Regions:
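Short, aromatic- and glycine-rich surface loops/edge beta-strands on solvent-exposed regions
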Residues: 64-76
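Alpha/beta-hydrolase fold nucleophile elbow
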Residues: 249-259
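Cap/lid segment of the alpha/beta-hydrolase catalytic domain
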Residues: 174-235, 243, 290-300
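N-terminal cap/lid segment of alpha/beta-hydrolase-fold proteins
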Residues: 2, 114-159
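Short beta-strand element of the alpha/beta-hydrolase
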Residues: 151-155, 161-172
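Hydrolase active-site cap/lid region
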Residues: 263-310
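Structural beta-strand segments of beta-rich domains
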Residues: 10-14
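Short beta-strand elements
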Residues: 77-97
Length: 310
C-alpha cells in the first residue's frame, strides 16, 4: 500500500530491491526478520531476488499496531541493513497504561508547592544574539527546593502585546540559542532547559555532565514519585508559564511546544496548567510505558523493555 496502512487481517507485502551505486543487483540473497515494531522478531527467513526484485510476504496483525521488516544483504564482503514499517489500523491503538486513582489529587497537592516559590526572575541581555527586531536574554527563575530553571528568551523589540510560546526541550544536556525566527514574527519565545544549570555555557561542560552526573537522568529518583527527576521539571514548566505571564509585553496567551522528551513535557504542562491555550506535540516520548508488560512496544525511554524489570 502506498500509504503503508493496512486493515487488520490483511496481508502485508514488501517490495525488495538491492542497489549498488544505483544499479539493481540480481540473484542476491536477502535475509529478513519480521517483528511487531520493537518487539523480538517472530519470523526469520531468506529470499533470493529473481531478476532485479523480490517480494517479502510479512503477514498480518490481529490487533492494531505496527509491523516492521528488517532486511539484510551481504555484498562484496559488507552487510547492508534496511528497515520498513507498516501500520495496521494504528488509529485504533489504545494505551495499556492506566490512570492512577489518585493522579489528580496528587498533582493538585504537588502544584500547591509552587505557591511558596518566589519567581525571582533574572534577565541578562545577550547582545551578540540580538537583531534589529528581536532582543535575546539568558533568563532564570525560581523553582522548588531552592533550584532555578534557566532558558533563553527571545522577544520582539517593538512595543506591544504578544502571545508567548514555551519551547520545552528534547532529551539530552546541551546549550540553547533561542528562537529568534519565531520572535521576529511576533511571539515571545522561551526555550528552557531542565537541568537547573545555565544554558549558554561552553559545549564541553554539557558533554561532561551528560557523561557524568546527568548520565541516565531519566532514571534519577524513579523509585519514588516525590523524588523522581521529572517532578521538579514538571513544576518548573508550570513556573515558566508564571514567568511568561509576568512579562509586560505578554498578551496573556501562552502556548507550549516540544518533541520527543519535549513532546511529553508539552503534554504534561498543558494538563497541569490550564492557562495553556495552545499545545504543539511531535513524536512524544514516555508514552504507554507499560505496553511492554502486555507484549507491545512502548515509547522512549522504554523503561520496561527489559524483561527482568517487568
Amino acid at each position: 500500500h502506498e500509504d503503508a496502512i493496512y486493515r487488520l487481517g490483511e496481508t502485508s507485502k514488501f517490495k525488495v530491491v538491492a542497489l549498488d551505486c544505483g544499479i539493481m543487483l540480481s540473484n542476491i540473497q536477502v535475509d529478513y526478520e519480521v517483528s511487531e515494531d520493537l518487539m523480538p522478531a517472530h519470523t526469520k527467513k531468506s529470499i533470493t531476488l529473481k531478476g532485479n526484485e523480490g517480494t517479502i510476504v510479512a503477514g498480518t496483525m490481529k490487533q492494531p499496531g505496527y509491523l516492521r521488516v528488517k532486511a539484510v544483504v551481504e555484498h562484496e564482503g559488507s552487510k547492508y541493513t534496511s528497515y520498513s514499517t507498516v501500520g495496521f489500523e494504528p488509529d485504533k491503538l489504545l494505551p495499556k497504561v492506566k490512570m492512577p486513582e489518585d493522579f489528580d489529587a496528587y498533582w493538585t497537592k504537588t502544584l500547591k508547592l509552587l505557591d511558596k516559590v518566589e519567581l525571582a526572575p533574572k534577565m541578562d541581555l545577550i547582545a551578540d544574539r540580538c537583531t534589529d527586531k528581536v532582543d535575546v536574554y539568558h533568563i532564570s527563575f525560581g523553582n522548588i527546593k531552592g533550584t532555578r530553571m534557566y532558558g533563553v528568551l527571545t522577544m520582539p523589540k517593538k512595543e506591544g502585546k504578544y502571545p508567548s510560546i514555551l519551547k520545552v526541550p528534547g532529551a539530552g544536556v546541551h546549550a540553547m540559542s533561542g528562537n529568534v525566527a519565531w520572535a521576529a514574527k511576533g511571539a515571545i519565545v522561551l526555550e528552557i532547559g531542565i537541568h537547573g544549570i545555565p544554558v549558554i555555557l561552553e559545549s564541553g561542560l554539557y558533554s561532561d555532565l551528560s557523561n557524568g552526573v546527568l548520565s541516565n537522568y531519566v532514571l534519577h529518583g524513579i523509585e519514588n514519585r516525590d523524588t523522581y527527576f521529572f517532578r521538579r521539571v514538571y513544576l518548573g514548566c508550570v513556573k515558566a508559564v508564571d514567568f511568561l505571564l509576568s512579562l509586560t509585553k505578554s498578551n496573556g496567551k501562552v502556548g507550549v511546544i516540544g518533541g520527543s522528551q519535549g513532546g511529553m513535557l508539552s503534554l504534561a504542562t498543558s494538563y497541569l496548567d490550564k492557562r495553556i491555550s495552545a499545545t504543539g506535540v511531535y513524536f512524544p516520548a514516555f508514552c504507554d510505558q507499560e505496553a511492554y508488560m502486555h507484549g507491545r512496544t512502548g515509547g522512549w525511554p522504554h523503561f520496561f523493555k527489559n524483561k527482568e524489570i517487568c
